[in-house]
Amino acid sequence: MDPKISEIRKSYTLSSLEIEDAGSDPVLFFQKWFEEAVQSEVLEVNAMTLATVTQDGKPDARIVLLKGILKESFLFYTNYESRKGTELETNPNVCLVFFWPELERQVRIEGNVTKVSREVSKEYFHSRPRESQIGALASPQSQKIPDRKFLEGRFQKFTNQYQNKEVDLPNHWGGYAVYPCRIEFWQGRSSRLHDRIVFERDTSSSWEKFRIAP
């Protein structure tokens, strides 16, 4: 291993996390942390790793953007025919990870996904920049394409098709809601003795809260 890589390390000293601080509702506590990250001007504060599993059990992950919290679920939008979309169709279990280094914090959310209603997807779709709406139509996401000109040609085709018209929400595009069953809040501490507070749903659908070792 390159010694320069192995020597990279940082001591975390900004804050602490007591179990009492997390309250009784992990979604509300997430919103509190998220707002603090926004106020701290974290770059791409809503960026999160979305981990999925392929049909043959291989892990897969990518960065997507959180686009809302609705009825205790975390929302993101994508092409349903993309690689992630096909994986979610066969296995709805996912994990989300937020990392906010400016605050020395991480949040892990385990749960399962369901598609949101077409009405919810349509409302968000039409809130996007027009170019992004056309891009969703033009891009056969995760499919092989011959070159970039192919993509640019499709973009121009749909730009012309929808000139002076509202862009239709594609049938293959929409939102997912992640319903959590476990949420972990991680606060960096000195000596690698980090604070880790976990909320886990029990059989009664209420939350159990406990501390785990770093």
From Swiss-Prot:
First-tier enzyme category under EC: oxidoreductase
Cofactors demanded by this protein: FMN
Keyword Flavoprotein tagged: yes
Positions contributing to FMN binding: 62-67, 77-78, 83-84, 106, 141-142, 186, 196
Cystine crosslinks: none
Enzyme Commission number: 1.4.3.5
GO annotation, biological process: pyridoxine biosynthetic process
Keywords for this protein: Flavoprotein, FMN, Oxidoreductase, Pyridoxine biosynthesis
Molecular-function annotations in GO: FMN binding; pyridoxamine phosphate oxidase activity
Family: Belongs to the pyridoxamine 5'-phosphate oxidase family.
This protein's name: Pyridoxine/pyridoxamine 5'-phosphate oxidase
Native organism: Leptospira interrogans serogroup Icterohaemorrhagiae serovar Lai (strain 56601)
Gene name per UniProt: pdxH
